[in-house]
């Protein structure tokens, strides 16, 4: 759900607040999302501040839930059985390349067969900090369960030049 929300052209903090509002409304899994009415999803998204795309996103969340129920019996852990999990994620309505990358980046900490996963944004951050730009080399720096944290930090470095400069200065002892 969060990957779908983060895939839209909306600020990350609003997407996270909307995910929290959906969760608080009891829309916590594919079954509850599919069982909710379109309006219930719109209302929950609105409470989370997700207003610009709320109607479209409500429809997408309903379709996504239906696909997850049909293909995975409501259990995304079955995605682990897919020969190409990123391609399978892209089949889910509302999940684009960015959403698939976010999902795989975060889930690798609990699904070790996906680690080390480093998408282009992670690799951009690694290059900006002078680190190796290969998933395997980056994965060698941390335990598998910590790879999502490293990846998230590198994404922040990719998106925020000043943060990257601060990290580099701290590493040099300035």
Could you say what each language-model-derived stretch is?
Residues 1-5, 45, 61, 103, ...:
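Short alpha-helical scaffolding segments that buttress acidic/His motifs in well-ordered protein cores
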Residues 25-93:
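Alpha-helical ds-nucleic-acid-binding substructure associated with the helix-hairpin-helix region
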Residues 8-10, 26-27, 69, 130, ...:
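Short alpha-helix boundary/capping elements
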Residues 3-14, 51:
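A short secondary-structure junction motif
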Residues 11-16, 31-34, 54-58, 97, ...:
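Alpha-helix N-cap/helix-initiation sites
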Residues 16-26:
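A positional/architectural concept
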Residues 97-174:
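C-terminal accessory module of base-excision DNA glycosylases/AP lyases that mediates lesion recognition
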């Amino acid at each position: 759900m969060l990957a779908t929300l983060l895939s839209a052209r909306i600020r990350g903090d609003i997407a996270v607040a909307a995910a929290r509002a959906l969760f608080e409304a009891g829309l916590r899994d594919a079954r509850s999302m599919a069982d909710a009415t379109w309006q219930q999803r719109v209302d929950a998204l609105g409470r989370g501040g997700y207003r610009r795309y709320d109607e479209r996103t409500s429809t997408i969340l309903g379709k996504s839930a239906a696909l997850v129920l049909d293909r995975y019996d409501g259990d995304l852990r079955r995605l682990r059985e897919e020969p190409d999990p990123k391609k399978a994620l892209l089949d889910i309505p509302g999940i684009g390349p960015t959403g698939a990358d976010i999902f795989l980046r975060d889930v690798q900490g609990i699904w070790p067969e996906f680690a080390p996963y480093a998408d282009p944004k992670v690799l951009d951050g690694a290059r900006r900090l002078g680190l190796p730009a290969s998933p395997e080399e980056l994965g060698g720096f941390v335990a598998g369960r910590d790879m999502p944290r490293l990846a998230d930090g590198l994404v922040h470095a990719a998106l925020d030049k000043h943060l990257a400069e601060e990290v580099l200065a701290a590493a040099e002892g300035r």
